[in-house]
């Protein structure tokens, strides 16, 4: 039985699962380490009104979260996940690449090397770190040697710690409360008291369809990406109420509607979700909730929940949550990637 598999001990002794859960279990400590790293960078307070964020994939989701946080304070932001970024006058340019070798991010950054005093990079190493050393760009270093998607808390903590130094203090959080929430998601918690295990069992038997609204758009997208990468599950992702005017007509028979919920959820959205549940049946829907009633803490808890769900789903499917065969192979055969890295190596001398 699937419950026996997730509640057993032997499966977590397999090296790929042991390592993946080990990385995830360090979530709060990794965030705290990132904060310390960001706070250690020498910087003066500045008036920040316009921010450009460069990043893609596991690093790009960090850009998304930071952009949402900054926007909530009235700061104009743009997240670029392309090969080139929009020109313009920016007070701050944030480049995030865990490996330091992300071609899209590096190519975009080449446009702004004459504004090195406005740039801050978050990375573990690679060409981005070398570029910082050569040009005097500020670099927030995070620990190396792990898959980028598992370094989300390190990178988020790193850039939030740096933003504190600029006078933008967003990191007042109750980390002990987040740790307490995480304890309920770990592998030693049985399925009947572990929402991540319970969700994974349902997802493993269905076609997952993730519906989000503005307040939970990012946690929902995180779940989609982690199911893709860790569990090798293809899933649908759409925003409501828009999705309720088209794709609900095509929900497959084995479809499972997954909706992250927020304490900031608008009344109209709440009633819409209630109606959708009545229409499809409660057995066809799965709600994901955090415990915190603080904006940033809720985001982190929902991300954490999504990550654990994806790992438990990978266990049930018997796939390796650490290896990405197609993504890495595509990088190897993509001539654009090699051209960008060649140009950057010329810049580095």
Give the location of each predicted region.
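A generic structural motif
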Residues: 79-82, 233-244, 284-293
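Short, glycine-/Ser/Thr-/acidic-enriched flexible segments
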Residues: 58, 215-216, 242, 262-265, ...
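Phosphate-moiety recognition in structured ligand-binding domains
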Residues: 2-37, 46, 130-140, 151-156, ...
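Glycine-rich phosphate-binding loops that contact phosphosugars or nucleotide phosphates
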Residues: 40, 44-187, 201, 260-286
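Active-site phosphate/pyrophosphate-binding segments
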Residues: 18-23, 33-50, 164-255, 333-349
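A short acidic, often aromatic-flanked loop/helix-cap motif at beta-alpha or helix-coil junctions
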Residues: 86, 145-150, 243-245, 291-297
């Amino acid at each position: 039985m699937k419950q026996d598999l997730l509640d057993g001990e032997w499966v977590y002794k397999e090296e790929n699962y042991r390592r993946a859960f080990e990385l995830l279990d360090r979530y709060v400590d990794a965030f705290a380490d990132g904060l310390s790293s960001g706070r250690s960078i020498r910087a003066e307070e500045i008036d920040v009104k316009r921010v450009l964020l460069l990043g893609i994939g596991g690093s790009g989701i960090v850009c998304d979260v930071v952009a949402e946080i900054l926007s909530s304070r009235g700061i104009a932001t743009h997240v670029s996940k392309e090969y080139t970024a929009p020109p313009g006058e920016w007070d701050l340019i944030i480049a995030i690449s865990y490996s330091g070798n992300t071609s899209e991010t590096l190519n975009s950054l080449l446009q702004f090397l004459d504004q090195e005093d406005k740039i801050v990079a978050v990375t573990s190493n690679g060409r981005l770190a070398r570029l910082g050393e050569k040009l005097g760009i500020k670099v927030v270093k995070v620990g190396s040697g792990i898959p980028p998607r598992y370094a989300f808390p390190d990178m988020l903590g790193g850039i939030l710690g740096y933003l504190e130094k600029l006078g933008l203090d967003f990191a007042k959080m109750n980390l002990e409360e987040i740790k307490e929430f995480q304890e309920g998601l770990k592998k030693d918690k049985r399925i009947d008291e572990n929402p991540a295990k319970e969700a994974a069992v349902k997802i493993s038997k269905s076609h997952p369809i993730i519906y989000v609204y503005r307040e939970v758009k990012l946690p929902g997208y995180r779940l989609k990406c982690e199911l893709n990468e860790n569990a090798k599950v293809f899933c649908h992702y759409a925003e409501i109420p828009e999705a309720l005017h088209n794709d609900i007509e095509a929900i497959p028979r084995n479809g499972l509607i997954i909706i992250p919920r927020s304490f900031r959820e608008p009344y109209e959205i709440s009633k819409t979700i209630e109606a959708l549940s009545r229409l499809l049946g409660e057995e066809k829907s799965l709600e994901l909730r955090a415990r915190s009633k603080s904006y940033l803490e809720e985001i982190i808890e929902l991300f954490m929940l999504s990550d654990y769900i994806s790992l438990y789903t990978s266990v049930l499917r018997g796939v390796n949550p650490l290896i990405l065969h197609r993504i890495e192979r595509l990088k190897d055969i993509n001539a654009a990637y090699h051209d960008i890295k060649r140009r950057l190596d010329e810049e580095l001398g």
